[in-house]
Amino acid sequence: MVDEITNETAQTVAAGQLRAFIERIERLEEEKQTISDDIKDVYAEMKGNGFDVKAVRAIVRLRKKDQAERQEEEAILDLYKAALGMV
C-alpha cells in the first residue's frame, strides 16, 4: 500500500515537473519569436534608411567572433583569393 502511494506521488511529481518544463519552453519560444520579429523590424528600418542589410548582417556575424578567429578567416580568404587571381 505504501509502495503504491509512493509510486503515485512520484508519478504526480514527475508529471508536474514535465509540465513545468514544457510550459517554460513554450514561453521561451514565444519570447524568441518576438525577439526575432523585432530584429527583422530593425533590419527593415535600416534598409528603409538606405543601409545595405546584407553588409550589416555580415558585420553582425563578424562581431560575434573574437579578433583572432576573424583574422584567421580573413587570412585564409585572402590566400584563396590570391590563388584564384582575384586580388
Swiss-Prot record:
GO MF terms, alphabetically ordered: DNA binding
Positions in coiled-coil regions: none
Stored InterPro entries: GapR-like, GapR-like_DNA-bd
Domain of life (superkingdom): Bacteria
Family: Belongs to the UPF0335 family.
Name of the featured protein: UPF0335 protein Meso_3367
Taxonomic lineage of the native organism: Bacteria, Pseudomonadati, Pseudomonadota, Alphaproteobacteria, Hyphomicrobiales
